[in-house]
Amino acid sequence: MKALVICLLVIFAAVIAVPVESRRKHLDYGVITKCAGPNPPPGCYPPGAQQKNPTPANEYRRGCSKITRCKRD
């Protein structure tokens, strides 16, 4: 009797699980792009900011400065 009930439960679970898996046939846009989600990872920019040129962290100057006291050619 127990084996029959267990077999029926397994069959019933398999019949119910098939339609649940076949409902979604496409991916959501939020799954594809991580930056579109509510909590974007570091490195994501707000919409429209990717076209702008990034600002440099520090300005590069070639050669020596007064403070380093290095020889000049």
From Swiss-Prot:
Disulfide bonds: 35-44, 64-70
GO molecular function: hormone activity
One GO term of the biological process aspect: cell-cell signaling
Tissue: Expressed in flowers.
GO CC terms: apoplast
Parts forming coiled coils: none
InterPro entries tied to this protein: RALF
Compartments, as annotated in UniProt: Secreted
Assigned keywords, A-Z: Disulfide bond, Hormone, Secreted, Signal
Signal peptide limits: 1-17
Pfam family membership, one: RALF
Protein family: Belongs to the plant rapid alkalinization factor (RALF) family.
Protein name: Protein RALF-like 10
Name of the gene: RALFL10
